[in-house]
């Protein structure tokens, strides 16, 4: 409004902070925007941009939060709050991650944004929480692959199931789903009569997760067929096993 133009940058900024303290982020955003608009090159404007990112995120206005955070990084790339701005960008995606059954594009974007934070701001205080959330988002994507793989397995669409479980083993090997993925591969390969592949998947599972319930199930599954875990053939599982022996896998 015209009236707002009569106030100093600090006065408007203080009003915005007052609204934040009252848990009214939408009202605060309007005042932070006024500071940026009326006093564009001031220190208060700089603070207002990062606070717009924060307030929009509080208000669950994720796109607006990202826009403000990206603007901050563009204007002040060397500033100490740039790491926080990048964290807000990552959080704006992360906080939209839904159940495993939903589309995972937003999860992939969260991973990219966390990766960028860890790479560009390695000494930042936000690296630790970013790494933790990265691992959770990474697990989430692996969970999606597992869900689809189980769906195909249940319907005896074995090649389609194998493709999903293979993706978990190759691309999400540090996730919490890898042991199950290897067991499901044993199930699917045995169902198709691909004995070498089933034994190979069982051997990798035994090498890395010998104490797990999944390995016990695999071992008894193979034993029922008079088989044992052993790397056979020349396929993709042999390559994985070679990496295991060299300590390059898991």
Where are these regions (language model features)?
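Acidic, polar-rich low-complexity tracts and alpha-helical solenoid repeat scaffolds
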Residues: 1-250
